[in-house]
């Protein structure tokens, strides 16, 4: 299984699919299924029945669904462009994520 280099609260851009070009913040990363939940991306409508025991109203609800990791690229905070990520170790031995374009730490 491929390593997921995108973490929670990262800013990402969709590079393939119906939401291509949209930018959002990562809400959740699912390593088991290789999918990522992104804010305001891949929105679908669900028809929900009312449930009086939980005090839920029925109706049509819009919610986000996870996207496959390969359809996303992380956005570098310094060069503000979508980029690939590689790793480098600092002098203290800490593992850092590095932008491939500008060589700055993410």
Curated annotation (Swiss-Prot):
One of two assembly initiator proteins, it binds directly to the 5'-end of the 23S rRNA, where it nucleates assembly of the 50S subunit. One of the proteins that surrounds the polypeptide exit tunnel on the outside of the subunit. InterPro entries: KOW, Rib_uL2_dom2, Ribosomal_uL24, Ribosomal_uL24_CS, Ribosomal_uL24_KOW, Translation_prot_SH3-like_sf. The gene is rplX. GO terms for molecular function: rRNA binding; structural constituent of ribosome. It comes from Lawsonia intracellularis (strain PHE/MN1-00). Keywords: Ribonucleoprotein, Ribosomal protein, RNA-binding, rRNA-binding. This is Large ribosomal subunit protein uL24. GO terms for biological process: translation. PANTHER family: MITOCHONDRIAL RIBOSOMAL PROTEIN L24.
């Amino acid at each position: 299984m491929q390593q997921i280099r995108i973490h929670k609260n990262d800013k990402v851009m969709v590079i393939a699919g119906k939401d291509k070009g949209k930018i959002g913040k990562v809400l959740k990363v699912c390593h088991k299924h290789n999918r990522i939940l992104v804010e305001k991306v891949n929105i679908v409508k669900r028809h929900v029945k009312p449930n009086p025991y939980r005090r839920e109203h029925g109706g049509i609800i819009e919610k986000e669904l996870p996207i496959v990791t390969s359809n996303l690229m992380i956005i570098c905070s310094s060069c503000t462009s979508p980029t690939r990520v590689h790793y480098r170790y600092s002098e203290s031995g800490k593992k850092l994520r590095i932008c491939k374009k500008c060589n700055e730490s993410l």
